[in-house]
């Protein structure tokens, strides 16, 4: 890889003596895609890990990839859609089982969507009535990245129809969005989802980044930012992972991440 880059050390252990507590925060940071401010869970005392070095990683990266749910936006899109369709508690039970390793990501996605079975009109109404809330300072950070000439991508296990308004709000072209696709029949009833999308299965974010690398220079420095384990596991082919805990702190991700921030402002070197 050309140029001087920071060494990619193994993820450091969590700082001793810090318990990962949670509290409710106002997540209406520097703009939303509409709607009222919402609250979300974040850590009360979780300190960032090496934020200055993380900012240097961003400075040296040519490509920056973001997770969407609980990272770029405050919410988890499929959970919000399930609640809107009156299936919140049923979907939450499946999500809990999936997090416990009882099923694959794709199986969990299939089961949850078969529970929700949103119509095309319900999805349109949901997007209109419950627009996603942008995380604090993310819009300013993305603008900063673009001003520096960096390419910005969104990589999500959520759905492109829910993410498109977010991408538009941030000025990210839809060709730079890797997400799942809902499929509807000719009456607008839910049919299935596209299993050919890389993010529809376990390891899909790494697959997406491999495709991004193939489209760009092989020696491009790629950084993935996200709150979850699937984001952490995108290295490799991503060069770096920066954990984000501005909305929710996942203890295992915090423990394993070498770099961790709780506000996108910490990555702007200010």
Swiss-Prot record:
Residues that bind substrate: 76, 112, 156-157, 205
Highest taxon in the source lineage: Eukaryota
Cited InterPro entries: HAD-like_SerB (IPR050582), HAD-like_sf (IPR036412), HAD_sf (IPR023214), PSP (IPR004469)
GO biological-process terms attached to the record: behavioral response to ethanol; L-serine biosynthetic process; L-serine metabolic process
Active site positions, chain numbering: 67, 69
Chain residues that bind Mg(2+): 67, 69, 227
SUPFAM superfamilies: HAD-like
EC number: 3.1.3.3
Reactions it catalyzes: O-phospho-L-serine + H2O = L-serine + phosphate; O-phospho-D-serine + H2O = D-serine + phosphate
Gene3D superfamilies reported for this sequence: HAD superfamily/HAD-like (3.40.50.1000), Phosphoserine phosphatase, domain 2 (1.10.150.210)
Protein family (similarity comment): Belongs to the HAD-like hydrolase superfamily. SerB family.
Stated name of the protein: Phosphoserine phosphatase
Gene: aay
């Amino acid at each position: 890889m050309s140029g001087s880059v920071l060494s990619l050390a193994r993820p450091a252990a969590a700082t001793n003596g810090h318990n990962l507590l949670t509290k409710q925060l106002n997540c209406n940071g520097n703009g939303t895609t509409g709607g009222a401010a919402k609250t979300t869970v974040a850590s009360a005392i979780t300190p960032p890990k090496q934020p200055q070095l993380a900012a240097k990683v961003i400075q040296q990266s040519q490509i920056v990839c973001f997770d969407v749910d609980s990272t770029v936006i405050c919410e988890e899109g499929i959970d919000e859609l399930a609640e809107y369709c009156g299936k919140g508690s049923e979907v939450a039970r499946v999500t809990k089982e999936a997090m416990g390793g009882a099923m694959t990501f794709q199986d969990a996605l299939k089961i949850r969507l078969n529970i929700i079975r949103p119509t095309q009109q319900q999805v349109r109404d949901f997007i209109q009535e419950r627009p996603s809330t942008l995380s604090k300072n993310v819009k300013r950070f993305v603008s900063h990245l673009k001003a520096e000439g960096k390419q910005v991508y969104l990589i999500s296990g959520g759905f492109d129809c829910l993410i498109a308004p977010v991408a538009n709000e941030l000025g990210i072209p839809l060709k730079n969005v890797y997400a799942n696709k809902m499929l509807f029949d000719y009456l607008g009833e839910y049919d299935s989802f596209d299993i050919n999308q890389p993010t529809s299965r376990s390891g899909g974010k790494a697959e997406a980044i491999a495709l991004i690398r193939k489209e760009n220079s092989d020696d491009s420095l790629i950084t993935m930012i996200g709150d979850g384990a699937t984001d952490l596991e995108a290295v490799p082919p991503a060069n770096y992972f920066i954990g984000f805990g501005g909305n929710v702190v996942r203890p295992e991700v915090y423990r394993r991440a070498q770099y961790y921030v709780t506000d996108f402002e910490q990555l702007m070197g200010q």
